[in-house]
């Protein structure tokens, strides 16, 4: 069937700001789909409120709208653009829910827009829990017994029938939001009340528990001709009860018998046909009772999902790209496999390696010790809590597991010092469980006992035990020949770990291994187990004899990615590395990407010329550098992870491109930076560096309270706090500093109360400096810059202060010897400007500033790194200021951490961001708030909590708002961490926790009342901006 030519213009909805349960995988799938559809001759309109994405780059779609993802703005875009079709399956749950709302409200019909990829009925059947159960019964497949309920009473009635525990799954929510496991009636009342509130349709499925069963997923694709292919099977190492996004997973499935697998395949094909997903991908989840083999269907996602991103990276089969092309009428057998160029997409991938994914968590950012449910603070349940993930490829499960563990950037012996009885308490589902299991295996706990405690399949436990036994043997039998070395390295053991076991240093072990000629070989991900030649260079390392990767003779550059997403190091850094790859490719260099994150555009097989899917450790990166012999490595774009490798790479003789390591060190070394600022005559707040807690207590009175305290060398404000007296400082040192593994020095800074903070992104070639963007923080000093709303250009900073900011930024860039990007943070009091810190690397604001001014900063930085100047790159305006305002607001996943009361402080907690653009700064702010899910009411009741709020109350009353003390309000403003804030989170109501936020929000509300809704594409905004 030829592609549909009756469709000319297609609208794609993105997934909005990154949050837990919906991360960079949708940027990856959306980017792939836009490229595929434009390549097939379609015009593409994209809408997404998230500026930190590749998909919102103005070059990608024909028209790009960075607007809030709600019905009003979508209708405005439909009216303006008149697309023929809407593809809803690439924007995660957000995109799917929005498409359904547009359909149900009759808006799609009004504008004559067709839903493609998945019809409304298929989406309803796949997402509506009751409809899905009925569909499964029709085709004779078992599901756990369950009932769709609309009230707590109905839920209690059903639970009494089937017995506890029961699982609660709210309808149409993301990453299991609002769901959970209830072990008794009191817990059910709590979980179900929350779930019913958070479900957009206020229903939830209460079902019998299959806790402890094995969990499997199949990625399935279907075309118009009813060809169905299974892309891969995925097995969850953690049993049922842990959300699949929070579970360690492995592909292909390892413990299914062939008969069980065939049964599952047949079921998956029947399901995709019954639900009616005519084109595209679906993810179907099954549970298997390990005792009886009983197989039940858990759920399906009739869209591209987190698992499909993982399946794409695991197999090399581009699910999102193929799904987009199937949606416009192609058949699977008409689409070639990019990797082999010989086989069509209707050939199921075959893989001759094992892939392991491990999630990355951020519990340390959200700290109540117990929530009201009695869940332990880091317990994993059916509600997803991880913020990122790492993937590794090996020839065996053991090798892939050990590579993935080191990709998390944590010591595999993280729990070595913990007492056995404490370790036994860590066997409930939590992020440390895999470390506890391995440590207990080292101490001789039998596999059967561990199985009873964890329900992790004995096969996986035996695999871990084999690694542990090999480590034990190694202590007394150091490797003596190549075979020994290959055996130990083939288990995924690092040089450092081998060194610890045999009593040698990492460098010595590396030298011994290389002297024997034992180096990794690189294998290729080819979708066909080496049956056909592969044309796309996508590689992983292993310790075997045959190398499948031959380096070319072209000049090449290695770009280091940022590893798993975490709070403080998000998709913004992936954005910067992808732009660098594209720029260097255009400039004629062969680009080599090294990264371990399966969710991102950087690890797409067609982003760089070569992709090494490897952990970002010094050993792994040096192996690649020695294999490829590049002209140099770029380590300043991927955040703190590659930056930490810069010193080791330089010591090993690797050339760092761009800003030299000496500049990075000078900016991060407190005393060196202080001396530099004094020499340049740039004011800094009073500050000291202490090497121990005792010294910190002695120095604090010299600097004077209040103090901003933090450990040196951290990202995302980890362990940063404002302390107001000696008692608070002592508590900080005992509770926050003492548990840190590395015990760095302690920075004590005078805290400037009431100062306006500015964030500046600049670009330097060593001669000239472009001050690309100056951003004003809405929240005052003391709130981490990554958690503050920002405006570009600034609204409330005097011109005299801005002149100083530009001048100081130029002086710092040139004095540090920056060749590339520089981020500087300032505090402004009146016209006085103080520098807080400078980071000679890509910052998390680079995508936002690039979109705001219409200049691709990361691309320019990469070209400067290989010797170009700003003049040569055609940059004429060194102080670009757009003739409109761009606002950025952050998203913090409070809802995922029951019991946590929202509060902003110096430690970063946001996972994502939204952007608003308008001629008026307050309307830009209003749009950014809407984009972040904060629906500020234009009228209604406001409740205030806290002292000294009379001025704000008067302003809100003057604006026509009624004040209330009760629970029935439309907006909550609480300047103290009151439990009512938690209730607002759970009821989905807007809330504000800072005085500045309340003031800005009121101004924004007043402007939004006056002016109607305006939507405009990024391309149109950029027409107005002065070209750099």
Swiss-Prot record:
The keyword Magnesium applies. Its EC number is 6.3.4.16, 6.3.5.5. Its cofactor is Mg(2+); Mn(2+). Mg(2+) 2 binds at residues 299, 301. Mg(2+) 1 binds at residues 285, 299. Residues 1-409 are annotated as: Carboxyphosphate synthetic domain. ATP 1 binds at residues 129, 169, 175-176, 208, 210, 215, 241-243, 285, 299. GO terms for cellular component: cytoplasm. Residues 934-1028 are annotated as: Allosteric domain. SUPFAM superfamilies: Carbamoyl phosphate synthetase, large subunit connection domain, Glutathione synthetase ATP-binding domain-like, PreATP-grasp domain. One of its GO terms (molecular function) is metal ion binding. GO terms for biological process: 'de novo' UMP biosynthetic process; glutamine metabolic process; L-arginine biosynthetic process. Binds 4 Mg(2+) or Mn(2+) ions per subunit. ATP 2 binds at residues 710, 750, 752, 757, 782-785, 825, 837. The keyword rRNA-binding does not apply. SMART domains: CPSase_L_D3. Residues 133-328, 674-866 form the ATP-grasp domain. Mn(2+) 2 binds at residues 299, 301. Composed of two chains; the small (or glutamine) chain promotes the hydrolysis of glutamine to ammonia, which is used by the large (or ammonia) chain to synthesize carbamoyl phosphate. Tetramer of heterodimers (alpha,beta)4. Belongs to the CarB family. The large subunit is composed of 2 ATP-grasp domains that are involved in binding the 2 ATP molecules needed for carbamoyl phosphate synthesis. The N-terminal ATP-grasp domain (referred to as the carboxyphosphate synthetic component) catalyzes the ATP-dependent phosphorylation of hydrogencarbonate to carboxyphosphate and the subsequent nucleophilic attack by ammonia to form a carbamate intermediate. This is Carbamoyl phosphate synthase large chain.
């Amino acid at each position: 069937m030829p592609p549909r030519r009756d469709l000319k213009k297609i609208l794609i909805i993105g997934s909005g700001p990154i949050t837990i349960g919906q991360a960079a995988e949708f940027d990856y799938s959306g980017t792939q789909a836009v490229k595929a559809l434009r390549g097939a001759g379609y015009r593409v309109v994209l809408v997404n409120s998230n500026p930190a994405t590749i998909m919102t780059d103005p070059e990608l779609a024909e028209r790009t709208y960075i607007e809030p993802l709600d019905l009003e703005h979508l209708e405005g875009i439909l009216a303006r653009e008149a697309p023929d079709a809407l593809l809803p399956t690439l924007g995660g749950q957000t995109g799917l829910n929005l498409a359904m709302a547009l359909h149900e409200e009759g808006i799609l019909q009004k504008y004559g827009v067709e839903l493609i990829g998945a019809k409304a009925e298929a989406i309803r059947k796949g997402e509506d829990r009751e409809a899905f159960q009925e569909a499964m019964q029709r085709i004779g497949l078992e599901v756990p017994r369950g009932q769709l309920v609309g009230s707590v009473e109905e839920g209690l009635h059903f639970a009494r029938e089937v017995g506890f525990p029961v699982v609660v799954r709210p309808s149409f929510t993301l990453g299991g939001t609002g769901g959970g496991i209830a072990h008794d009636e009191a817990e059910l009342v709590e979980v179900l009340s929350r779930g019913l509130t958070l479900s957009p349709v206020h229903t939830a499925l209460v079902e019998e528990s299959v806790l402890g069963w094995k969990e499997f997923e199949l990625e399935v694709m279907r075309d118009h001709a009813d060809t169905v292919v299974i892309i891969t099977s995925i097995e969850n190492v953690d049993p049922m009860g842990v959300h699949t996004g929070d579970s360690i997973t492995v592909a292909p499935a390892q413990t299914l018998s062939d008969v069980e697998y065939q049964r599952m395949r047949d079921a998956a094909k029947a399901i995709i046909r019954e639900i009616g997903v005519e084109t595209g991908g679906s993810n179907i989840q099954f549970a298997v009772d390990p005792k009886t083999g009983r197989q039940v269907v858990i759920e399906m996602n009739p869209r591209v999902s987190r698992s499909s991103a993982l399946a794409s990276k695991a197999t090399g089969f581009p699910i999102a790209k193929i799904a987009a092309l199937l949606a416009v009428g192609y058949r699977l057998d008409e689409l070639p496999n990019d990797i082999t160029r010989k086989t069509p997409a209707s050939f199921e991938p075959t893989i001759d390696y094992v892939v392991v994914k491990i999630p990355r968590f951020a519990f340390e950012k959200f700290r109540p010790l117990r929530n009201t449910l009695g869940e332990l603070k880091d317990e994993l349940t059916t509600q997803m809590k991880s913020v990122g993930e790492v993937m590794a490829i090996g020839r065996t499960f053991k090798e892939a597991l050990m590579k993935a563990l080191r990709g998390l950037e944590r010591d595999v012996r993280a729990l070595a010092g913990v007492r056995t009885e404490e370790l036994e308490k860590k066997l409930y589902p939590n992020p440390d469980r895999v470390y506890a299991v391995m440590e207990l295996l080292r101490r001789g706990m039998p596999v059967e006992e561990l199985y009873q405690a964890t329900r992790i399949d004995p096969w996986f436990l035996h695999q871990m035990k084999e690694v542990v036994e090999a480590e034990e043997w190694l202590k007394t039998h150091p490797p003596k020949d190549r075979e020994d070395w290959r055996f130990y390295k083939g288990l995924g053991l690092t040089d450092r770990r081998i060194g610890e076991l045999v009593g040698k240093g990492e460098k010595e072990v590396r030298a011994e291994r290389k002297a024997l000629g034992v180096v990794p070989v690189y294998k290729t991900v080819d979708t066909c187990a080496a049956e056909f030649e592969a044309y796309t260079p996508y590689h992983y390392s292993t310790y075997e004899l045959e190398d499948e990767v031959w380096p070319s003779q072209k000049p090449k550059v290695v770009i280091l990615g940022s590893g798993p997403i975490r709070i403080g190091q998000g998709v913004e850094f992936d954005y910067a590395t992808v732009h660098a790859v594209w720029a260097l490719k255009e400039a004629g260099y062969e680009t080599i990407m090294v990264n371990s994150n399966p969710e991102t555009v950087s690890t797409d097989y067609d982003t760089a010329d070569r992709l090494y899917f490897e952990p970002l450790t010094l050993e792994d990166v040096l192996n690649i550098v020695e294999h490829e012999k590049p002209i140099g490595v770029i380590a300043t774009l991927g955040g703190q992870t590659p930056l930490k490798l810069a010193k080791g790479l330089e010591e090993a003789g690797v050339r760092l491109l761009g800003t030299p390591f000496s500049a990075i060190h000078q900016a991060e070394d407190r005393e060196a930076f202080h001396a530099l600022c004094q020499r340049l005559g740039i004011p800094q707040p009073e500050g000291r560096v202490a090497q121990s807690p005792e010294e910190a207590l002695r120095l604090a009175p010299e600097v004077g309270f209040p103090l901003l305290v933090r450990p040196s060398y951290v990202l995302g404000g980890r362990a940063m706090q404002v302390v107001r007296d000696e008692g608070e400082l002592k508590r900080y040192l005992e509770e926050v500093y003492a548990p840190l593994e590395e015990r760095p020095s302690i920075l004590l800074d005078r805290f400037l109360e009431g100062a306006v903070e500015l964030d500046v992104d600049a670009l330097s070639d060593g001669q000239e400096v472009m001050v690309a963007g100056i951003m004003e923080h809405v929240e005052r000093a003391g709130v981490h810059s990554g958690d503050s709303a920002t405006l570009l250009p600034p609204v409330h900073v005097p011109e005299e202060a801005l002149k100083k900011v530009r001048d100081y930024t130029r002086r710092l860039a040139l004095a540090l010897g920056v060749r590339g990007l520089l981020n500087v943070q300032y505090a402004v009091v009146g016209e006085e400007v103080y520098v807080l810190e400078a980071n000679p690397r890509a910052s998390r604001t680079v995508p936002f500033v690039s979109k705001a001014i219409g200049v691709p900063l990361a691309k320019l930085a990469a070209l400067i790194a290989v010797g170009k100047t700003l003049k040569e790159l055609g940059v004429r305006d060194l102080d670009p200021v757009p003739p409109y305002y761009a606002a950025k607001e952050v998203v913090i996943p409070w809802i995922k951490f029951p019991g946590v009361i929202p509060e902003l402080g110096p430690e970063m907690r946001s996972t994502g961001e939204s952007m608003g653009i308008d001629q008026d700064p307050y309307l830009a702010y209003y749009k950014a708030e809407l984009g972040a899910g904060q629906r500020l009411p234009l009228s209604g009741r406001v409740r205030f909590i806290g002292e000294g709020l009379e001025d704000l109350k008067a302003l809100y009353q003057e604006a026509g708002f009624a004040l209330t003390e009760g629970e029935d309000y439309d907006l909550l403003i609480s300047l103290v961490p009151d439990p009512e804030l938690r209730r607002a989170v759970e009821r989905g109501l807007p809330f504000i926790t800072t005085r500045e936020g309340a003031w800005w929000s009121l101004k924004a509300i007043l402007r939004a009342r006056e002016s109607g809704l305006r939507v405009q594409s990024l391309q149109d905004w950029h027409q107005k901006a002065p070209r750099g």
